[in-house]
Amino acid sequence: MEPGSKSVSRSDWQPEPHQRPITPLEPGPEKTPIAQPESKTLQGSNTQQKPASNQRPLTQQETPAQHDAESQKEPRAQQKSASQEEFLAPQKPAPQQSPYIQRVLLTQQEAASQQGPGLGKESITQQEPALRQRHVAQPGPGPGEPPPAQQEAESTPAAQAKPGAKREPSAPTESTSQETPEQSDKQTTPVQGAKSKQGSLTELGFLTKLQELSIQRSALEWKALSEWVTDSESESDVGSSSDTDSPATMGGMVAQGVKLGFKGKSGYKVMSGYSGTSPHEKTSARNHRHYQDTASRLIHNMDLRTMTQSLVTLAEDNIAFFSSQGPGETAQRLSGVFAGVREQALGLEPALGRLLGVAHLFDLDPETPANGYRSLVHTARCCLAHLLHKSRYVASNRRSIFFRTSHNLAELEAYLAALTQLRALVYYAQRLLVTNRPGVLFFEGDEGLTADFLREYVTLHKGCFYGRCLGFQFTPAIRPFLQTISIGLVSFGEHYKRNETGLSVAASSLFTSGRFAIDPELRGAEFERITQNLDVHFWKAFWNITEMEVLSSLANMASATVRVSRLLSLPPEAFEMPLTADPTLTVTISPPLAHTGPGPVLVRLISYDLREGQDSEELSSLIKSNGQRSLELWPRPQQAPRSRSLIVHFHGGGFVAQTSRSHEPYLKSWAQELGAPIISIDYSLAPEAPFPRALEECFFAYCWAIKHCALLGSTGERICLAGDSAGGNLCFTVALRAAAYGVRVPDGIMAAYPATMLQPAASPSRLLSLMDPLLPLSVLSKCVSAYAGAKTEDHSNSDQKALGMMGLVRRDTALLLRDFRLGASSWLNSFLELSGRKSQKMSEPIAEPMRRSVSEAALAQPQGPLGTDSLKNLTLRDLSLRGNSETSSDTPEMSLSAETLSPSTPSDVNFLLPPEDAGEEAEAKNELSPMDRGLGVRAAFPEGFHPRRSSQGATQMPLYSSPIVKNPFMSPLLAPDSMLKSLPPVHIVACALDPMLDDSVMLARRLRNLGQPVTLRVVEDLPHGFLTLAALCRETRQAAELCVERIRLVLTPPAGAGPSGETGAAGVDGGCGGRH
């Protein structure tokens, strides 16, 4: 145990006494297995606890919960090869005697299981003192010669159940293969069986150390937790999408049908995957889903101290092993990595505990436990869980012939870097906690202090979050998509400056994406360079890829089929609207005028059924000539009556990208499920049309829709504004503008992950933008700067205008043919280069006996298997400077110690202040000492901790500090109370891991304090923009369905509710993986 850690009495982690007894499963109707009654004698013997320095025999630390955990190990773990299991034996002399005791106890437990639960427990309790005395008096036999009692235990079959009856819960309940347990036993030799039982000692020793931690958990929770943590068969990360066939998934995470009764939480029931026939007929998909859900809840409910101390215990064990492997470079690097993991975990635990202690003060209400502090703690716990799983895998397989040293070292280094940066973010959050007023999430202080805080924050290293650790905090089903997006992004960025368009860029990116797919470190460094240095025009071009005709057509083929999907062009003509206070009076609604003068507004009408008015001549005259007219593809159907409802939708895209076409797939589903026509506004985009052009167009289209709702197939009785991200911002501002004009306000608003604060203010959730692959901080700042009217570079090419359309086609064709040749050659050369390096390293002579594995030999080599010319050994600074050129063999190697990476000085970043003030601010900053910088990072960090700094100079990352960002029609959160009181009922659907989460929480808090009807639902483990990913996985579909339910509350309020609809419900959604 680490010095300074507290020792807690045994009563803190003993299983709960109120457990139902386990009854044998009978043939016929399926029954739910439950836990066995605890033996009072066993509990009494385990109540006493000695100091950690007194090493007791291993069996004296065993509990019934661990017997269950050990007895529920997968059969696949018992089928390991003899050589692999031999290496799993511990190196310490004391625990080598415990396998004998363990085998005898397991043999007696199997015999007792045939006599009944109560009798078996008594027999074990009576014989345990004698066994302990025998253990102390006589040394245990070596691993090669088992004692007679052990041989008898090995000769006993693993399962002696009657034919047709199910096995006892103490035996493995499921098999990972199609063969029966009897066949599996026949294929395993006696030597393998002996060594398999001996190999389980490592897991037993790990669980024994876990008992010394502060925990109070039931036996079933201990069993599920121990099986998840000790799953060393699969090398993939926790919850990875490739875990479908892993033993933890196929072997059953918990007993089928058992409710995990977490303290203070509602039970989570894992349904059985079979219907009374055979456990082998369950589908792997359902097992995979159950494993992910259970592992996710274990992460949520696992005690933070338990997780940290478990990780520290494993790290110390790995340090002791690799330190004894000689002076090899790889062994030293592995020892250094685990030392860093131990240091960062111990430093992070108290900081996370402090944040958790006050996080509830920033929630909307007790039923809605969501804010940036909680999200930051959850992200850190996810990183600790991944390191815990990876450390356990290394501890169990480090001497195996199949152990990939280089791969596991790279994984550990990446997650250690992520953990280090997360610790820095936690210290930032503590600084915000001290500075902000109680209950306020956004920093409120002097703008100079805010600038200094964000300038220091933006210089943190980010590449580690975009390589191997990409999206580790999100649901596993969405991580492959994020990897595809990141590879496409960095490949697209290489060809952005070449002024290519269309198919040429896509083809070039395809051929250059190979090296980024092979090398995650290079991909992360390039991702960081692009996000910090490329301007908003790049992001606009990249996000608009979904607007291509080919991609949009494919998306529409997979979406629901609707009768009406038309692109309309609203003429820029003023019209009158009646006032709500006095309908006899009217107000003139002028067409949009800002920046570019009067112009038409494009809207898309979507309706599942053809309704009255939608095929009128007046509406047909507004159809844009090149717009979709899906109505013409259908024979003229019978018209449906006008709907009572109308949905006005504003799409997202950061105010700079996308149109209604990108969001059409889920809008079609909305039209089908809600039975209401939808009108989606294609507002003008920044930077060509900054604020307030988009607001003017959206308000003009909203008023036009109210006045001409009959043409849209609606009576206009209920009108709902809906939008996501930037569209959510427009929902609030349009409603505020309607109230200011005195015209009809909508009946309700559904905003998904809206941006309500565009002012450059720090908040705990916005700290997550450091690692968010879809909404990095630099991208957020550039989008807001463009919408606020900041000057951007003009990338319009006069040569393209002179070429014309046919000239562009000919030029792109020539570039495409050239890229086919150069791209294929580059990709093949990079692949052959990496293969050649690997073959050269493998051909080096290994002066070791044949009994040693390749990994063992690599640990002892003076020059490890990762040569100094490998990309894995380059620092991220070297990778960024390397670019497309070749790196010489004398490139310095990657060292993940904080002392090596911290000296890199951050470059000055013009993040908040205008360009003319950046130089003076930088000079003043350099003159100040660390203690005089107020919110400076070095003053916020404890002594000895140094986060990693980015080597990329973010010279093009200004956030326009114009006073316009404080305009309530741009930042609704800053609106005065009188304006917020004019809003209709608001329904917000936010993401717990979204950098914009605090925007939603603070707006909901303000509306709640004003007595306004508001609901807040927070979905877990999903990124910003999940609506456009609705068809990707089950979690995104459930989140999209939640948005539909919120809209339905506006269109059809529940019976008994007033015109404001639902007023009090708020919470964190559990159907989408939320906290229960």
Swiss-Prot record:
Put simply, this protein is called Hormone-sensitive lipase
Q: What is its EC number?
A: 3.1.1.79, 3.1.1.23
> How is the activity of this protein regulated?
Retinyl ester hydrolase is inhibited by bis-p-nitrophenyl phosphate.
The record's GO molecular-function terms, alphabetically, read: all-trans-retinyl-palmitate hydrolase, all-trans-retinol forming activity; diacylglycerol lipase activity; monoacylglycerol lipase activity; retinyl-palmitate esterase activity; sterol ester esterase activity; triacylglycerol lipase activity
Summary of the function given for this chain in its UniProt record:
Lipase with broad substrate specificity, catalyzing the hydrolysis of triacylglycerols (TAGs), diacylglycerols (DAGs), monoacylglycerols (MAGs), cholesteryl esters and retinyl esters. Shows a preferential hydrolysis of DAGs over TAGs and MAGs and preferentially hydrolyzes the fatty acid (FA) esters at the sn-3 position of the glycerol backbone in DAGs. Preferentially hydrolyzes FA esters at the sn-1 and sn-2 positions of the glycerol backbone in TAGs.
Compositional bias per record (Basic and acidic residues), positions renumbered to this chain: 65-77
**Distribution of this protein across tissues and organs:** Testis.
Family matches, as InterPro entries:
AB_hydrolase_3, AB_hydrolase_fold, HSL_N, Lipase_GDXG_HIS_AS, Lipase_GDXG_put_SER_AS
Composition-biased stretches (Low complexity): 150-161, 237-246
Question: According to its UniProt record, where is this protein mainly located?
Answer: membrane
Source organism per UniProt: Homo sapiens (Human)
Assembly information from the UniProt record: Monomer and homodimer. Interacts with CAVIN1 in the adipocyte cytoplasm. Interacts with PLIN5.
The EC category is hydrolase
Q: What's the PTM story here? A: Phosphorylation by AMPK reduces its translocation towards the lipid droplets.
Biochemical pathway: Glycerolipid metabolism; triacylglycerol degradation
Pfam families from the entry? Abhydrolase_3 (PF07859), HSL_N (PF06350)
Linked disorder?
Answer: Lipodystrophy, familial partial, 6: A form of lipodystrophy characterized by abnormal subcutaneous fat distribution. Affected individuals have increased visceral fat, impaired lipolysis, dyslipidemia, hepatic steatosis, systemic insulin resistance, and diabetes. Some patients manifest muscular dystrophy.
The region called Disordered is annotated at: 1-198, 229-250, 838-930, 1055-1076
Q: Which GO terms describe its cellular component?
A: caveola; cytosol; lipid droplet; membrane
**Similarity comment: family membership:** Belongs to the 'GDXG' lipolytic enzyme family.
User: Where does this protein have compositionally biased stretches of type Polar residues?
Assistant: 1-12, 38-64, 94-116, 172-198, 882-908
The record's subcellular locations are: Cell membrane; Membrane, Caveola; Cytoplasm, Cytosol; Lipid droplet
